[in-house]
């Protein structure tokens, strides 16, 4: 796997996490191939870089690539992938599977599952993947979904093993257990990445509500490395990374003036 670090910037809306993610991705790309991913429904990458980004991976500069994910399209692709797989293994219940696919598209965690699946694919292609996350509640749901999906595949694995016994007794080939094990392995790879190669920067400013949301991220993501960042720092003392404010941080040159060395030092230590 090419990935060295998966980096999330999370926090309350309006604290500058998108600006920081852009600046950090730009600096990391000077070292190795880097992808900046926006999963915030209110995408801001294009506005900060002053370059149209869009929902397909686009090279912005040298080794810097970016994409603004469209959650609806991701869910549709993911549902079609599931539908295709289930139809292959269970052709006799094709109509029921199509109905099931509707539930996948509209399930409460459909977006989060599709996003995680795609991010893991990106980890195979880039040394650094930097994620400009959605506001706090949505970002936390992303990580909660991982644990839920992981438990679901453990259950499916047991069901598939029982089905395999019947198919073997009937003298028929059954590839379903292998498929589920492959999906479980993909989830295990993601678990390893989250545990060993992931950093979440909980971004806040000196306003109490943003500090509370950043602390919520710290409290709830106990199995992942979380570091507090105070953006637009003025005077507050804390055990955190402090980033002073600059005016109009738009465009490549302005982003390079942002004092993000403490974040880079933390990531590359």
Where are each of the predicted segments found?
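Switch/connector loops and helix/strand junctions flanking conserved nucleotide-binding motifs
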Residues: 44-48, 74-78, 137-141, 236-238, ...
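Walker A/P-loop NTP-binding active-site region of P-loop NTPases
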Residues: 7-69, 133, 142-149
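Hydrophobic "anchor" residues on beta-strands that sit immediately upstream
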Residues: 7-8, 36, 128, 201, ...
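Phosphate/Mg2+-binding loops and adjacent switch elements
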Residues: 90-201
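C-terminal lobe/tail of nucleotide-utilizing enzymes
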Residues: 2, 52, 184, 188-269
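Short, high-confidence coil segments that cap the C-terminus of an alpha-helix
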Residues: 4, 32, 125-127, 223
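Short, well-ordered alpha-helices that flank and scaffold nucleotide-derived cofactor binding pockets
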Residues: 26, 30, 121, 219
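P-loop NTPase motor core
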Residues: 50-103
């Amino acid at each position: 796997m090419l990935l060295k670090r998966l980096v999330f910037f999370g926090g309350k809306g309006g604290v500058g996490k998108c600006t920081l993610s852009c600046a950090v991705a730009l600096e990391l790309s000077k070292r190795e191939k880097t992808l900046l991913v926006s999963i915030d429904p209110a995408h801001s990458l294009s506005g900060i870089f002053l370059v149209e980004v869009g929902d397909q991976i686009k090279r912005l500069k040298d080794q810097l690539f970016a994409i603004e994910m469209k959650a609806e399209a991701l869910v549709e692709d993911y549902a079609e992938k599931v539908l295709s797989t289930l139809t292959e293994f269970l052709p006799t219940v094709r109509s029921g599977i199509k109905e099931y696919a509707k539930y996948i598209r509209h399930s409460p965690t459909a977006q989060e599952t599709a996003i995680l699946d795609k991010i893991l694919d990106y980890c195979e292609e880039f040394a650094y993947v930097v994620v400009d996350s959605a506001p706090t509640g949505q970002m936390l749901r992303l990580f909660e979904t991982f644990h839920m999906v992981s438990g679901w595949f453990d259950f499916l694995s047991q069901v598939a093993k029982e089905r395999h016994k019947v198919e073997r007794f009937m003298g028929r080939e059954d590839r379903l257990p292998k498929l589920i094990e492959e999906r479980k392995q993909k989830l295990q790879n993601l678990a390893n990445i989250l545990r060993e190669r992931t950093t979440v920067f909980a971004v806040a400013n000196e306003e109490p509500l943003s500090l509370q949301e950043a602390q919520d991220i710290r409290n709830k993501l106990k199995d992942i490395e979380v570091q507090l960042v105070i953006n637009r720092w003025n005077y507050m003392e804390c055990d955190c990374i402090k980033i002073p404010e600059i005016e109009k941080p738009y465009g490549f040159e302005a982003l390079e003036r942002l004092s993000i060395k403490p974040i880079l030092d933390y990531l590359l230590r």
